[in-house]
């Protein structure tokens, strides 16, 4: 990951585990989440993901996504170019995330907003954060249970169910606001 001296980085590296969305939504998600301060993006093949990529197609997409991340990083004055990692299966993504300090999974059956606020408020300087966002159709119950078993905490993003392309940006914006330093 290319790095330069900058005061534009958040105090905590945030990893976005994004369920593969349809169409070109992933490009938009990458662009906006890089602008908001994400450290790395992990595309994830979940059970309900409509998009199925073979190895050759996946590599081509990842190359394109990294070019988009680089462009967004330059535009927003980032000190790093966040990496878009190769597409992972759900279990691989959970294993990769195991090392992170705080793991969140926005989920419509999560406890109320106060529990989410408390979890976000507990994130402190230097901790690594993983956010799991489902594809269109969300996560299967078994996927949420596997994430919880690995230490991910279900959180709510409010009373509305957000689209896959909105959910990651929403929680990143909340974390950015909480973690921003003068």
What kind of feature is each model-predicted range?
Residues 89-94, 111-113, 162:
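A short acidic, often aromatic-flanked loop/helix-cap motif at beta-alpha or helix-coil junctions
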């Amino acid at each position: 990951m290319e790095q330069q001296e900058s005061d534009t980085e958040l105090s905590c590296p945030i990893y976005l585990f994004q369920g593969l969305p349809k169409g070109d939504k992933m490009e938009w998600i990458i662009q906006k989440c890089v602008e908001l301060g994400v450290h790395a993006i992990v595309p994830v093949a979940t059970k309900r993901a409509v998009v199925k990529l073979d190895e050759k197609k996946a590599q081509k997409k990842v190359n394109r996504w990294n070019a988009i991340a680089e462009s967004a990083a330059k535009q927003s004055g980032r000190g790093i170019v966040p990496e878009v990692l190769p597409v992972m299966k759900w279990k691989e993504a959970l294993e990769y995330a195991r090392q992170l300090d705080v793991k969140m999974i926005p989920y419509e059956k999560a406890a109320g907003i106060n529990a989410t606020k408390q979890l976000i408020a507990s994130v402190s300087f230097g901790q690594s954060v993983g956010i799991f966002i489902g594809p269109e159709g969300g996560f299967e119950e078994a996927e949420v249970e596997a994430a919880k078993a690995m230490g991910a905490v279900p959180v709510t993003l409010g009373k509305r169910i957000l689209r896959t392309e909105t959910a990651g940006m929403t929680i990143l914006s909340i974390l950015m606001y909480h973690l921003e330093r003068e």
